[in-house]
């Protein structure tokens, strides 16, 4: 039997907010260091995909953990600081736009997830992965949880770390590549971003040339 489990769950069984039940169940089985793993940035036209792995202690006092997309910027930033201070271990990995183009976004995301689990200072005994896919060659058993950032506090913590990290990277990119509004839309295909690409063209190393929308703009310029 495979030690990796893909857990496709009914969306109607989502808890009101993420909880520690998956982690406690695994700890009762002898897996004490549970890493929650999540990604941010699969869909944007520009910038990296960023992943984070977070191991929380079971007596953590983080209040209001949830899927990063459901939090205000202020609350997300507060929780980000609290996670950095209280987590047993945190690891972050990113794959740049060029590398995404050389592979594909799914493979790049899984590779970034693998790297951040491998990079944990406290080795994970088990990994809870947000989504349907489990990265290959992990150093520990793993389970994939659909909507995991709404089920597991460890995955929710990872989603916050990945989101804040990527947003800050894109804010910096906005200072370097002015005129694209990256600090506002962080690379997503907003009307303003598409208009800027149409006017200035895509940027090598920033935009994902393997994405259909960028390909179309490139062909129009050519």
UniProtKB/Swiss-Prot annotation:
Keywords: Cytoplasm, Endonuclease, Hydrolase, Manganese, Metal-binding, Nuclease. Its main location: cytoplasm. It is an enzyme of class 3 (hydrolase). Its EC number is 3.1.26.4. PROSITE patterns: RNASE_H_2. It is found in: Cytoplasm. One of its GO terms (molecular function) is RNA-DNA hybrid ribonuclease activity. InterPro entries: RNase_HII, RNase_HII/HIII, RNase_HII/HIII_dom, RNaseH-like_sf, RNaseH_sf. GO terms for biological process: DNA replication, removal of RNA primer; mismatch repair. It comes from the Bacteria. It catalyses: Endonucleolytic cleavage to 5'-phosphomonoester. The keyword Manganese applies. Endonuclease that specifically degrades the RNA of RNA-DNA hybrids. Belongs to the RNase HII family. This is Ribonuclease HII. It comes from Bartonella bacilliformis (strain ATCC 35685 / KC583 / Herrer 020/F12,63). The gene is rnhB.
């Amino acid at each position: 039997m495979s030690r990796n489990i893909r857990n496709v769950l009914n969306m109607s069984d989502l808890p009101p907010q993420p909880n520690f039940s998956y982690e406690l169940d695994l700890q009762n089985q002898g897996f004490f260091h549970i890493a929650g793993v999540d990604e941010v940035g699969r869909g944007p036209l520009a910038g990296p995909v960023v992943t984070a792995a977070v191991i929380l202690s079971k007596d953590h006092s983080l209040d209001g953990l949830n899927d990063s997309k459901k939090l205000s910027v202020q609350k997300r930033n507060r929780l980000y600081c609290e996670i950095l201070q209280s987590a047993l271990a945190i690891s972050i990995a990113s794959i740049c736009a060029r590398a995404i183009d050389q592979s594909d976004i799914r493979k790049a995301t899984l590779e970034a997830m693998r790297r951040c689990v491998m990079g944990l200072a406290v080795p994970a005994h088990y990994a809870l992965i947000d989504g349907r896919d489990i990265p290959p060659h992990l150093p520990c058993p793993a389970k994939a949880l659909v909507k995991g950032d709404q089920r597991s506090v460890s995955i929710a913590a990872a989603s916050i770390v990945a989101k804040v990290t990527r947003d800050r990277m894109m804010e910096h990119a906005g200072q370097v590549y002015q005129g694209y509004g990256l600090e506002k839309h962080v690379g997503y295909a907003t009307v303003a971003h598409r208009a800027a690409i149409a006017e200035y063209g895509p940027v090598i190393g920033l935009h994902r040339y393997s994405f259909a929308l960028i390909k179309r703009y490139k062909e129009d310029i050519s």
